[in-house]
Amino acid sequence: MTLYQKYETDNAYNYLQQIIDLLEEPICLLGGWAVFFTVNELYKKETGSDYLGSKDIDLGFHIDMNFKEQQLKNTTMGKTISLLEKNGFQSQGSRYYKDISIENGRELTSEESKNEPAHNVFKMYIDLMVDNVHPSFRKIFNFDPLDEDLLNLVFEKTTMRTEITTFKKLLWIPAPEILLSTKIKSLPNRTEDKRIKDICDIYAISFFSNKKVTELMKESKILLEKDRFEKLKPFLESDDDFLTAAEHLLVDGESIKNLFKELIKT
């Protein structure tokens, strides 16, 4: 049983390499691929398999609230948007995408995509997220950005990020406690496949990163308001999601449920 189809994660990984090659260092990587690079070494040592990949690419950007409009255009965010557009990615708000043929992996033009059966088209998404929403952002870039205030810590404090060299580029990856906190925040609003992936990620970060689970839980409770953990309580009403996540993680479903019980404790 697979969470995502192999062509989805393979395509995303290939495009991740291409995008990283285009961008200026350091590159802040978020989401599922950030979790992958955080946990994969220990996870593979424990299970013999690579950790779950992602079907999307998530990138983070610092926005200085004091920037003038021209400075905003010249930020890493602005340069990234220009590069994506020059390389054929289409805008869908804060998401950029390409349509890919599932049959042969070929990039499709807009016209070709319209003429293809929907089941033969995979949308390769790149999500752009900022730490601060500049008042002129929409005027300059014509969309409202996704924002995450915890990203401020990643850009401000070296202790809140892990710096790795991958694909010959310097990547900044949020520290495990930041990744865990963002997953806890996003989980209650997720639809099925994303929900299961977030549960997997919460467990993997807790047990396969370079920090002890007790330390991570303590730090996440400093970073997040109490109500964020309260919103996890409905997940304890059924074992279904935990059992599904356990199949993907190659672990016991009860251990995932027990982790959630500990997270919910005040």
Where are these regions (language model features)?
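Compositionally biased terminal segments of proteins
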Residues: 1-266
